[in-house]
């Protein structure tokens, strides 16, 4: 499936051109190493710029993209009122819970906790030897603290 994007003036996206220019200048003034900047609304591209030595054909290695994409998807579902950030994550993954039921801390874990990396684990769960089900490991590895109380960079929470 390929989506066609339209190139339009920022005003056609209800965006002030001067705000886009000021934003781009602010990034540059703060020495943020930009490769590209694309501003879209719907299927419309309102601004597209590239920073030397990069151009629209430059390839990039991508790391930790799952977190961004999952967060975007959750935001869309939240905007459509299909879920709440305070929903308990175990309600969405009943088939991944241990046979004897979820741990108490796991039952308390919310989508909000997951998005903010304040889960009940203090490390990535699927890196334990012998684990092949990354999603399942999140629910079967014993939690170490109450959710929402500690930040821990945890890749398994987004998988």
Question: Where in the sequence are the language-model features?
Answer:
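Short, compositionally biased leader-like segments
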Residues: 1-16
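A short, well-structured edge-of-sheet supersecondary motif
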Residues: 19-55
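A generic structural signal for nonpolar/aromatic side chains embedded in well-ordered alpha-helices
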Residues: 24-27, 114-115, 138
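Extracellular/periplasmic catalytic domains that process cell-envelope and extracellular macromolecules
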Residues: 30-31, 105-109, 144-145
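Active-site SXXK
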Residues: 43, 61-86, 114
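Catalytic-site signature segments of enzymes, centered on catalytic residues
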Residues: 56-57, 102, 121-159
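Short alpha-helical patches at coil-to-helix transitions and adjacent helical residues
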Residues: 65-71, 108, 153-159
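Active-site helix/loop module of the DD-peptidase/beta-lactamase fold
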Residues: 80-121, 140
């Amino acid at each position: 499936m390929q989506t066609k994007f339209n190139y339009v003036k920022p005003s056609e996206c209800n965006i002030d051109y001067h705000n886009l220019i000021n934003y781009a200048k602010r990034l540059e003034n703060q020495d943020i190493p930009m490769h590209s900047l694309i501003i879209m609304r719907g299927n419309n591209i309102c601004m597209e710029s590239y920073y030397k030595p990069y151009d629209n054909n430059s390839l990039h290695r991508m790391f930790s993209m799952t977190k961004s994409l999952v967060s975007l998807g959750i935001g869309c579902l939240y905007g459509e009122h299909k879920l709440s950030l305070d929903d308990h994550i175990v309600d969405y993954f009943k088939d991944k819970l241990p046979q004897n039921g979820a741990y108490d801390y796991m039952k308390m874990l919310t989508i909000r906790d997951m998005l903010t990396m304040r889960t009940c684990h203090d490390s990535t769960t699927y890196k334990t030897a012998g684990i092949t089900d990354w999603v399942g490991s999140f629910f079967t590895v014993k939690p170490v603290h109450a959710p929402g109380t500690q930040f821990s960079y945890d890749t398994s929470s987004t998988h």
